[in-house]
Every structure is written in structure tokens, then in C-alpha cells.
């Protein structure tokens, strides 16, 4: 799995003519991982392949709202085996994509030593709707 920094570097290497993404490192309470003047970006790295990938409703709502307020797009990137799967959430909302929102018991954090589970509202991003890099 790539680190968040490696995902950002890979994105920037692929999109040389665009403004580079910058990691949000100085704000531990940020709801997104990287940004540019065009994008708010949530990044996940996974070690298992899925046909649909989980997106948390809380992050969806707050980042989509922030994107609208600042005139940017909300991009969701999942890295799997060095491949980037990229969804433009604004575009999916514009075409009435069905996220299939529902509640599930999931780990409170991605810190695997913390086994505490909480109910989270989540939806799904189908791989077939992603751009692959």
C-alpha cells in the first residue's frame, strides 16, 4: 500500500499540467487529506480489492459542502496495489448516482490496534465509475 504522501506524489506526477495537490498536514481535524485550488481530496489506501468502495456519509456531506462553498470539486481517491481509483463526487451527485446509503458497524478509526466499533452511515463507490491511473 502507498502512503498518503506517495498517493499525492503519484497524482502530481500524472497530472503535470495541473496545479499540484498539497497534503493537509498542519490540521489534524481536517476532513480531507489533500487540496488544490481545484480539488478537495479524500485518500484511502487498501490492501484488498472490492467492486465497491466505502465512503462515509459524514465525510461526503462535509467535504461536498466545503467544495461547493469554495468552488472546488470533491475527489475521492482509493489506492490499491499502486493503482489509483478516482471518483469526482461532484460529478456523481450531478448525475444522481445512487450511493446506497445505510448504517453499519465499522471500526471507529483505521488504527488497527483500536478494535472499537461504532455505527457509521456509509455509501458505496463502484469501481466501474472510477477513473484508473
What are these regions (language model features)?
Residues 11-13, 61-74:
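Metal-dependent nuclease catalytic cores in nucleic-acid-processing enzymes
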